[in-house]
């Protein structure tokens, strides 16, 4: 397809359905903005009748929903998958970004940080202040898990609390202030076999004297057929994105930790009833979150239970649970199911190169960030199976940058 000129691209019909406080909507718009295209934004929360219009056009009950011309792209994950596969630019009718030519030398940096979030951005701040001129491969889903967090109340320095996206924007600006270069693309390959270490994105290669892995973690799913079949049709892992779509309805949250309780409390703003389904008879979340949820009149707990099936044909109409002690089953009438059963580390890229523990977390020298490979450091949720907090992630990001700086000095790298 020949590339369109700027005016043709500007006039191309791109529609994105969004709502307020939707992190994936913000990420989708940022990706489209990076392509130099304009779009029409339809806020289904503030514009009457637009929710039903979106559902009719897309068959989905999640935001964002993106249409490019006559093509229904889907949500942010679909948009970013097209970008990673090199399919987005042709659909937009624009020339692709710079493509590495055969034999062309990779771009070299003293420090490359793979991943963003509080760990990656903190590592970048410290590395940049040490004049190491770091490159951050932030990923298309930049900012880590905090981008999906409504309120952060336990990070020092924010007495009134702060939203996750707001906090990550501040981290990013601080990193850039000191000279960090940020690329919002996914790393497709990492080579730790020899120095300089290699990192690839879709169409470019980079090398680094020191590598910091801050790849974070991703939400776990139940792994049942009905969950996958009804994904984005009432099944979600992002209450801030999709909760308001089910205003006045009953909903369910699966899980018993802080994330599940936070989701339940947020959903209670919109729902008539929120069922929290937990496989144990006690919660794992912090005391203050437990108290808030247990005392909330709209939240009902379904103890000692697991989800056997998400019920529904076209959209979610219920959830079938089973008590793990009595084997008794019941069906709860809900129109949305939010999964909050924990996370797993994003370590697939380096699985056969770096030592991992049995759960897939990167192992490091005790008290440090050094992996089993000299010059490769790890921080954040990718190496922390215990705490998994924003403040501890930031702390390990600091450690990784300092460890990398000292190691480079020992190697005589300038």
Regions inferred by a protein language model and the residue ranges of each:
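Local sequence-structure signature of Cys/Sec-based thiol-disulfide redox active-site neighborhoods
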Residues: 10-42
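Beta1-alpha1 glycine-rich phosphate/pyrophosphate-binding loop at the start
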Residues: 19-20, 33, 109-178, 249, ...
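Thioredoxin-like thiol-disulfide oxidoreductase module
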Residues: 43-61, 87-95
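Non-catalytic, surface beta->alpha helical segment in thiol-disulfide oxidoreductase systems
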Residues: 70-96
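Glycine-rich dinucleotide-binding loop and its adjacent helix/turn
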Residues: 100-108, 217-270, 364-366
